[in-house]
Design a protein with these regions (language model features):
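Active-site acidic/histidine proton-transfer and metal-coordination neighborhood
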Residues: 1-99, 109
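Histidine-acidic metal/acid-base catalytic patches
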Residues: 20-21, 83-194
Length: 194
């Protein structure tokens, strides 16, 4: 546990040293053989210790959802999957340096919507990971099943003017690592011009 805290404290210090004002954290890699309550308590305790360090460094921690049991082939953690779970954690900790990162693929897999996220978090959303995908993971733009243009319109309708990142969708594109970004940027440029 202490090694984990030191690791994340180093990440916070590195982010601050690089001039980054945000650091995205998630619960991937959680132990599936432990009770959810224990995992929740451990995550809350870790964040409780990290939030003051992040605030002192001028870094905002963004809690990102992870794939859960609803996606068994790529499940990352049994907790902190849905918008409701992230909302409960934010309310439990109630710290100004803690926000969220919206990942459109995980959002969709959990049955949430952009409107759900903005209804819960609005000013707590510090980053949007705009990524296509399905229940088997992330895909290059247009190769998943998600309504990406609808997500863009929803973000615009909600007045989101913050940063958007494009997640590199894993090992399937190792032979062409630039391909997913090229697809996403082409789609985004087309959307902006429309």
């Amino acid at each position: 546990r202490e090694a984990t805290l030191r690791y994340y404290e180093s990440c916070i210090a590195l982010a601050a040293g690089l001039g980054c004002d945000r650091l995205v954290l998630d619960a991937s890699g959680a132990c599936w053989d432990r009770k959810d309550e224990l995992l929740w308590r451990s995550a809350a305790d870790t964040l409780y210790h990290l939030c003051p360090a992040a605030q002192a460094a001028g870094v905002r921690l963004l809690l990102a959802p992870v794939m859960g049991a609803e996606t068994p082939l790529i499940a990352e953690s049994p907790i902190l999957n849905t918008a409701a779970e992230l909302d409960a954690m934010l309310h439990q900790l109630n710290h100004p340096s803690l926000g969220v990162c919206l990942d459109t693929n995980i959002m969709s897999a959990c049955g949430d919507t952009v409107y759900d996220w903005f209804g819960r978090f609005r000013d707590k959303i510090g980053l949007v990971r705009l990524c296509d995908g399905n229940y088997h993971g992330w895909r290059a733009w247009g190769e998943g099943v998600l309504p990406m243009q609808r997500y863009l319109h929803a973000l615009d309708a909600m007045g989101y003017r913050g940063d958007i990142s494009l997640r590199l969708p894993g090992e399937r594109y190792l032979a062409q690592p630039a391909y997913p970004d090229e697809r996403a940027l082409a789609a985004l440029c087309g959307e902006v011009g429309a």
